[in-house]
Amino acid sequence: MSLALIAERYESDVDQLPQTHSELGGGAARAASGLVYENLIERTCEELALDARKNDYKRTEEVNGACLKNLQVDKHIYRNSVMVKAVESKCYLDSCYLKRAVMDFIELEQSPEVPEWVEYAIFAGQNACGNDAFVYYKAFFKKMTGKEVKIFFVNPSRKRSSSRSIYNEQYREDFKLDSVVYNEFVEWLKK
């Protein structure tokens, strides 16, 4: 499937969300809207000959003799069986999701099972995060790891409004795929 067809599939998946909402309710529509972005990442990786893994659990570093074995984000991306990227996916990114993603990325960065060259990104439709939290958590990640966390907002209405949901047909244009940002994400994956 070409990248153009993958983008068309994204649009088709978003077009189905109002029906999901009317037939199955808000919870099902919210779950389906999250999958729209995860599926876009997965299909894009497939096209680029990358392996986007879900439930690819890693071990945390040991602290005072304790260690967790369930560390993961939405997609651990492999090239030639070697982990190269970690991506958290959100329909919209609020400060709670940003904080959690940054903390998970820091733990991944410190994991003995994650190569030191792994890069980190958040792939989201819209931004629901206040500016202070947005600036702080990006800076905190840099302070703790020495690395940048990339954040891609792929919908043209980058600022979220809770009254303009993705599964409301009236606001469909807010959720078109921004091809410029999507292509930036593709180029980042290729690096």
Give the residues covered by each predicted segment:
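Phosphate/oxyanion-binding active-site loops and adjacent basic polyanion-contact surfaces
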Residues: 33-41, 68, 94-98, 178
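Long amphipathic alpha-helical segments with strong coiled-coil/leucine-zipper propensity
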Residues: 54-74
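Catalytic cores of nucleic-acid endonucleases
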Residues: 82-85, 89-144
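Active-site beta-strand-loop-beta-strand hairpin of nuclease catalytic cores
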Residues: 68-86
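Secondary-structure boundary elements
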Residues: 46-53, 78-83, 111-115
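Hydrophobic, Leu/Ile/Phe/Ala-enriched alpha-helical segments that form helix-helix packing faces
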Residues: 41-49, 105-112, 141, 189
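Interdomain/boundary linker segments immediately adjacent to catalytic/signaling cores
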Residues: 1-54, 63
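Domain-level recognition of nuclease-like catalytic cores that cleave nucleotide substrates
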Residues: 110, 122-191
